[in-house]
UniProtKB/Swiss-Prot annotation:
This is Glycoprotein 42. It is found in: Virion membrane. Plays a role in virion attachment to host B-lymphocytes, through binding to leukocyte antigen (HLA) class II and subsequently participates in fusion of the virion with host membranes. May act as a tropism switch that directs fusion with B-lymphocytes and inhibits fusion with epithelial cells. The C-lectin type domain is essential for virion-induced membrane fusion. Belongs to the epstein barr virus gp42 family. Signal peptide: none annotated. Forms a complex with gp25 and gp85 via its N-terminus; this complex is used for invasion of B-lymphocytes. The lineage of its organism: Viruses, Duplodnaviria, Heunggongvirae, Peploviricota, Herviviricetes. One of its GO terms (molecular function) is carbohydrate binding. The chain crosses the membrane at residues 9-29.
Amino acid sequence: MVSFKQVRVPLFTAIALVIVLLLAYFLPPRVRGGGRVSAAAITWVPKPNVEVWPVDPPPPVNFNKTAEQEYGDKEIKLPHWTPTLHTFQVPKNYTKANCTYCNTREYTFSYKERCFYFTKKKHTWNGCFQACAELYPCTYFYGPTPDILPVVTRNLNAIESLWVGVYRVGEGNWTSLDGGTFKVYQIFGSHCTYVSKFSTVPVSHHECSFLKPCLCVSQRSNS
């Protein structure tokens, strides 16, 4: 028979047993497993099915198509506007001015013998033809060419945009009162364009009746 004195318990084992006994005595019933909480158990709930809509992404929009080509209808029926395609005609009395003038106190900037103005008042795109023609002598609604556009956008802040005089009539090319052909980021059915701080080309707008400042220009005298 083995006596109690002959049983040797390692020191760390004895300490561990003492700690367990103390915890069992002092911890409250809920932690020890007593009381009502002890009956609770963790229930694993399977992940519910999440419906993702649409399953497939929508097809990309072809901005080179007209609404009629895209939808089979000449009019785009949207909640707050119904623009009719290709109805724009250049106002008869507003053309490129053949004279020189520069209001050095009021121009926004001057570049390549031209003075550029961002109108202080906002107008519809069509209204910019009249607004620019009446701004100062020799001013007209201007469509920025690729070499001028970066200078225009540098003079805009991050939240500004303004109407520019790049347009098209019917299915024709994008042009301006100065003539030439322009590359435009196109929204089908629109004939009006604007630029903002980060524009690399003029952008056509879906609603030409929105109010924005206009880009006007006049030729500066060489003298």
